[in-house]
Amino acid sequence: MRACSRRPLAAVVAAALAAASCTIHQREQTAASLAGAPLGRSVCVLFMDGLSKAAFDHVLAAGAVPNLKREIVDRGLSYDTAVASVPSETYPNLGAMLTGLHPGHHGIPANIWLDRRLRLAESHTNIFRVHSAADFLVPDARTLYERLPRDSVAVTTPMGRGATVYAKNLVAVVASYARWDWEFLDRKTIDDVGDAYAGALDAGRIPSLAFAHLLGPDEVAHSDGPESAEFRAVLANIDRAFARLVRRLKRWRIYDRILFVLVGDHGNQSYTRTVEADELVHRALTSHPTEADCEAGNCVLVPASGPRQKTYDVGEAQIAVGAFRGAMIWLPASRPPADVPGAFAAGKRKKQKRPRGAPPPKIVMPATSDFAAALALAPEMGLVMTRGPVPGSVVVYGPRGRSEIVRDETGEGPPRYGYRVVAGEDPLGYASVPALAPFVSGAPFPADDWLFATAPTEYPDLAVQLPEFFDSPRAPDVYLSPKDGHGFRSGKAAGHGAVSRLEMVVPLVFAGPGIEPGRRPVARTADLAPTILAWLGVPFDANEMDGEDLRLLSAPLPPPPPLPPPPAGEPAEPQEPPGRER
């Protein structure tokens, strides 16, 4: 699109955004004036969509984010191995951070999922459906916003159920897609957070929670890769916008009341080799010719995108690729958990022509175990994971071996998890680590023991998280994680959704009142909700969450002093350069 043709659109968008900015200030001022007793402290979450720990460490070392380093990292508490939730996709992880529940328990197990009970297929990646995601949380899953005073703020995030002020910024999101200008959106998101603080301060309080969802890192990682100059530029832009927010908060004398949290939901892994998920399923089915015969006219042809433009017979399997590197498969013949009546019924499809008098075609899918074993032999595959024969068990298939995870819920206390290699080599590689010898014997160990023991490995915490993921009746029958360097969609530089370390380990840093700078070894991002509530002093029932309070404080915080008077106006901030265009 030529620059001159964008001017009318730019003018309309600018006017809409200016009005929205005023609205955020006014909405938060109104909400804060009506809320109950203030907490006197605040948590500001910088939710870095698509940022891995490895990528963040790289930009820190390169000096690309000096303000984040000075204001958060250098004076904060960092976790060396903060493990995201399985799968490494945005919606299940955002839900886990807001509710403290694993994706298998809060109702959104993936970006794209099927529900056999409701005969429902849901794609949260559809831009017209993104803000309906919270509708699918289970009734018992309460978000952070629902547990806090009525002064919380959520900006640009697709999941804001319970937030007092929810700025979806849909116009800005659409404009960013249209112009491919994510720097603009991330600047606006952080500036909106500042406007919300100003509005609350005008009412004599500060928001208990301000949640800024920064989309730029993930979108640019998909298009250019997390190692690219474009990716570093997006993070440098966030850094400058954050510096502007810090200046405003310090000027208003509320900076030292705020706990800053920098967290990622998943990483991104670059890939150069692409395979269609439909083709992989086709290969696995045709390795069982007596069970899925494509020559009898009973094939369901699924068009495959990409340069080859082939069609692949996938029987009645339902396949979803939510973030380019993880694939999920629902099999019609598979038996779902006992509380899920009936198998998933595929949607209506065009009937196949058959000779007069011929019997109706019938596809008989192979057993899940045979199907998964066939998939694991594909040269592109790293791991294939399925539900096990009993609830709470998972079978993991690799190219040269098979293992089993069993959750043990007997006795008192939280569940424990056992792991053993059933055949061949250990797919997760735990058996090759001498320190993990007790953990591969099949004996059950507590979840935290697994987290500490597997933190240095390629698959940290997987023995705990996979059984929890497959608890969901909406989880697939088969979950695919390809080898490094492979993805399921062409035209992308990087993706996520698999279980590799690069996709699962993210930055997690806390900086603010009562936080002693330093490092701790491990955490789960599902720990975020109880940790924030505990720091704010908001009571909660720990039994309602899978996550645990990370106990950031060595001593209780003293009561906060009275707030300063509202700001009497702000000096003009220096203008940012225009965002990059394509």
What are these regions (language model features)?
Residues K483-R519:
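Low-complexity, glycine/alanine/valine/leucine- and proline-rich hydrophobic stretches
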Residues E183-D202, P217-L259, N268-S270, A284-E295, ...:
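A long, amphipathic alpha-helix that forms part
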Residues G63, L77, P87-E89, N111-A133, ...:
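Secreted, luminal/periplasmic, and some membrane-associated catalytic domains
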Residues H25-G40, K53-R147, P158, A163-V165, ...:
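Active-site nucleophile/metal-coordination loop of metallo-enzymes that catalyze phosphate/sulfate
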Residues G382-G398, T454-A455, Y459, V538-P574, ...:
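Polar, surface-exposed loop/tail segments
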Residues A96, G100-S228, V234, R407, ...:
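His/Asp/Glu-rich, glycine-adjacent segments
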Residues P38-A54, E71-I72, M97, L148, ...:
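Beta-strand elements within well-structured catalytic alpha/beta cores of enzymes
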